[in-house]
């Protein structure tokens, strides 16, 4: 097995346990990242559909706003300077919040308040074209609301696109790099441990065979020594008895007269 396709680790049972734990964690992480990617992809497609729909509505809204502005200018003349002079506070405020989707914080923009129109603004165009100016203001308010919604969707779209790419790269890295390396490492450790067990078993068999051989040799030597001792013992006893038997004869000879 090539060392490039596995981790460089010494094959022990502890290392095998560690690799199995890492593989289990990698499988769990791959499953969770896959679910996260699927959830983000579903939300991504939904946002994309909303963007397409809002852009179509945006075209209609901006067209109405432009026509209403042209009609107001036709009816009241140039009134932009008068409007700018009468504006002191913004009539629309935008608030940014975050939405958590599968651990990803998506920025969301929303209109939180609409200021009260001042009397000077209401009186703009009172002499002529006042109705057209009010219609133009309402049309532009709708256009701003549509722009806020579209900006929120596009920001979430870009954020999700980046997160989905990163998540998919992690999923592919675990699936095609991390898991195969861990599996190959586990196979390598198991193979080496099996080989070590076979070598140890062979060594033990050789040691056991040598011990049996030595034991048989000792038993054979012991039996040979016992046989030699048995052969030598009768001659010694006979000789001793002969000497004892001769002594009384000598004693009788000494005391006879």
Curated annotation (Swiss-Prot):
Domain of life: Eukaryota
Molecular-function GO terms, alphabetical: proton-transporting ATPase activity, rotational mechanism
InterPro entries to which the protein is assigned, alphabetical: V_ATPase_D
Keywords in alphabetical order: Hydrogen ion transport, Ion transport, Transport
Pfam families found in the cross-reference section: ATP-synt_D (PF01813)
The protein's role, per its UniProt record: Subunit of the peripheral V1 complex of vacuolar ATPase. Vacuolar ATPase is responsible for acidifying a variety of intracellular compartments in eukaryotic cells, thus providing most of the energy required for transport processes in the vacuolar system.
Similarity section: Belongs to the V-ATPase D subunit family.
Oligomeric and partner information: V-ATPase is a heteromultimeric enzyme composed of a peripheral catalytic V1 complex (components A to H) attached to an integral membrane V0 proton pore complex (components: a, c, c', c'' and d).
Name of the protein this chain belongs to: V-type proton ATPase subunit D
Species in which this protein is naturally found: Dictyostelium discoideum (Social amoeba)
